[in-house]
UniProtKB/Swiss-Prot annotation:
SMART domains (UniProt xref): PIPKc
GO biological process: negative regulation of cell migration; negative regulation of mitochondrial membrane potential; negative regulation of phosphatidylinositol 3-kinase/protein kinase B signal transduction; phosphatidylinositol phosphate biosynthetic process; positive regulation of apoptotic process
Tree of life domain: Eukaryota
Quaternary structure (record): Heterodimerizes with other type I phosphatidylinositol 4-phosphate 5-kinase.
Name assigned to this protein: Phosphatidylinositol 4-phosphate 5-kinase-like protein 1
Pfam families (UniProt xref): PIP5K
SUPFAM superfamilies the UniProt entry points to: SAICAR synthase-like
Catalysed reactions, semicolon-separated: a 1,2-diacyl-sn-glycero-3-phospho-(1D-myo-inositol 4-phosphate) + ATP = a 1,2-diacyl-sn-glycero-3-phospho-(1D-myo-inositol-4,5-bisphosphate) + ADP + H(+)
Main location as per UniProt: cytoplasm
Location of this chain's protein in the cell: Cytoplasm; Membrane
């Protein structure tokens, strides 16, 4: 692979002004037209004066420069062991941005058909990030790229270490099951301002993209303790991600795609169980199909070649649990039922069932007798989420 040598390295970063695309007047107009819609979706532009504006500007400049490295040194094959351990630190004016396992993620992005130029344009300077106000109890910050295609989340050091330790097996799982429902992790980075403490963050594809017509969003863990969110007041611009108890009385009507969904959930949760991971979520969003989008032939004609690309035979396609993908952006996370389009993806893959979580399990067992909660063994967690999916689909 024509890439920098493995191990920690520190280099001066190029400036995004040297090569990033200019924001054209038509693009500015598009951004302005999106602002009203974004406010109605509960997304808030991180503009000058926002407390996170400085941080996100550094992230944008740093990600532009980091992506330029992978564009200058594109991967020529699957990642090596050294690629998974490489750490590149680029020095900018006033901050440093670290890129962890950069060549491995560059290869993964390429395998997903994601052009580095598009990735750089979406995450770099050119449009402010959007703040997403999460109902999560964690202290993480959540952002969306200005086009809402990519999701950024701050992570703790322990979680980042777990993600990187599991990265080779994660890549292998996606190779074996190209239509996996696991969220596509696209980058892991660190940001350090004026030689201070590092802030780690990840970049992933947004499960809820494109979001324009989505009516409901849910974060499902398959349990009941702390799994209720008070809905937003009528007329509020804030669109909340609701939880398990809010989902009562609802179903996911997938029709003939239900069997594929159940099988893929089994494959993905088995993989996470083998990693000793728990506390992940199934994200679900509803979008009502237009009349011309309904019916078995509405989007099948143009999608067959893309869906079977890479499979050598029908037997291999079945072993990989491939399906016909919709002719839509973000097709890996979209399943169409008879009446609704569903956005589905498994996220938050970094919590390991170590000593801390075992002690938390014991405490919650005493605190919530007879009730279900998230901190259980990975085997029980995987089984329970699959049971929830089976009970709430038709």
């Amino acid at each position: 692979m024509a890439a920098p040598s493995p191990g920690p390295r520190e280099v001066l970063a190029p400036s995004p002004e040297a090569g990033c695309r200019a924001v054209t007047s038509s693009r500015r107009g598009l951004l302005w037209r999106l602002r009203d819609k974004q406010s109605r979706l509960g997304l808030f532009e991180i503009s000058p004066g926002h407390e996170l504006h400085g941080m996100t500007c550094m992230m944008q400049a740093g990600l532009w420069a980091a992506t330029q490295v992978s564009m200058d040194h594109p991967p020529t094959g699957p990642p090596s062991r050294d690629d998974f351990s490489e750490v590149l630190t680029q020095v900018h004016e006033g901050f440093e941005l670290g890129t962890l396992a950069g060549p491995a993620f560059a290869w993964l992005r390429r395998s997903l058909g994601l052009a580095e130029e598009d990735y750089q344009a979406a995450l770099g300077p050119g449009g402010p990030y959007l703040q997403f106000l999460s109902t999560s109890k964690s202290k993480a910050s959540f952002f969306l790229s200005h086009d809402q295609r990519f999701f950024l989340k701050t992570q703790g050091r322990r979680e980042v270490q777990a993600l990187l330790a599991h990265l080779p097996r994660y890549v292998q799982h996606l190779q074996r099951h190209p239509h996996s429902l696991l969220a596509r992790l696209l980058g892991v980075h660190s940001l350090r301002v004026d030689r201070g403490k590092k802030t780690y963050f990840i970049v992933m594809q947004s499960v809820f993209y494109p979001a324009g017509r989505i009516s409901e969003r849910y974060d499902i863990k398959g349990c009941e303790v702390s799994r209720w969110v008070d809905p937003a007041p009528e007329g509020s611009p804030l669109v909340l991600v609701l939880k398990d108890l809010n989902f009562q009385g609802k179903t996911i009507n997938l029709g003939p795609q239900r069997s594929w969904f159940l099988r893929q959930m089994e494959l993905d949760t088995t993989f996470l169980r083998e990693l000793n991971v728990l506390d992940y979520s199934l994200l679900i969003a509803f979008q009502r199909l237009h009349e011309d989008e309904r019916g078995p032939g509405s989007s099948l004609i143009f999608r067959t070649a893309r869906s079977v690309q890479g499979a050598q035979s029908p037997e291999e396609s079945r072993a990989q649990n491939r399906r016909l993908l919709p002719d839509a952006p973000n097709a890996l996370h979209i399943l169409d039922g008879p009446e609704q389009r569903y956005f589905l993806g498994v996220v938050d893959l970094a919590t390991v069932y170590g000593l801390r979580k075992r002690l938390e399990h014991l405490w919650k067992t005493l605190r919530y007798p007879g009730r279900t909660f998230s901190t259980v063994s990975p085997a029980r967690y995987a089984r329970r989420l699959c049971q929830w999916v089976e009970a709430h689909t038709e």
